[in-house]
């Protein structure tokens, strides 16, 4: 730990080059493809994710409600795409080419190189699958290795236990709860904060790659080792 001329402990020196804004480049993995959200390309597929046939319980902790039809979805997607403070990706099944979900990079602090993944909206076909896990791997790799961020955040309603469990499985570390941080849907929300930092990334990356390896799955697609065991 460095000490200044007054005998006080201070933080380690760090390169203060700002982080790079996302450019929504296409990112291709073994099972999934991330690409810029597009009304023309993705709206029809995403109606199954955002529409009236989506599981009702998936909307409890999301800020927006489901849409009722394609026209409403087109309006919602246009609003998402037009936001200047968020960068939305569609998550594609590499085999079928269909969009199965979306997430965004948001709350971007370039000066301090801090960025958050949020607005995670996955269909059941993505949750707890190789595709869903790889989507998060591809985005984290992009954040740390291409955009040069030091801190990658995940936040959720403190009552949203599946979200917190997912974050911790993926390598995010719980840091604390901000009490009464948000009012939404007419109710209060305590917010759990979790993060992954650049020093964590090499270890987490190795775990992602070991778990995602085809050698980790049998002929029926069942994992041989859990993510935590890799």
Predicted feature descriptions by range:
Residues 145-155:
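Conserved GNAT acetyl-CoA-binding A-motif
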Residues 166-167, 194:
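Conserved active-site tyrosine of GNAT-family acetyltransferases
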């Amino acid at each position: 730990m460095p000490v200044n001329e007054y005998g006080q402990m201070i933080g380690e020196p760090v390169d203060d080059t700002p982080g790079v804004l996302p450019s929504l480049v296409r990112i291709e993995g073994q099972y999934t493809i991330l690409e810029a959200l597009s009304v023309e390309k993705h709206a029809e597929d995403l109606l199954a994710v955002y529409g009236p046939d989506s599981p009702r319980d998936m909307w409890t902790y999301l800020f927006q409600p489901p849409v009722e039809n394609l026209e409403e979805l087109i309006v919602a997607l246009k609003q998402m795409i037009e936001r200047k403070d968020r960068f939305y990706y569609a998550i594609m099944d590499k085999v079928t080419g269909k969009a199965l979900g979306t997430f965004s990079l948001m709350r971007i602090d370039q000066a301090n190189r801090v960025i958050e993944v949020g607005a995670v909206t996955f269909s059941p076909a993505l949750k707890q699958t190789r595709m869903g896990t790889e989507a998060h791997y591809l985005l984290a790799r992009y954040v740390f290795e291409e955009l040069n961020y030091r801190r990658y955040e995940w936040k959720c309603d403190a009552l949203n236990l599946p979200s917190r469990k997912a974050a911790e499985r993926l390598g995010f570390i719980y840091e604390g709860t901000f009490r009464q941080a948000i009012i939404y849907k007419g109710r209060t929300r305590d917010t759990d904060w979790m993060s992954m930092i650049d020093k964590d990334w090499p270890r987490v990356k190795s775990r992602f790659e070991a778990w995602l390896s085809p050698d980790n799955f049998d002929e029926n697609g069942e994992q041989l080792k859990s993510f935590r065991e890799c």
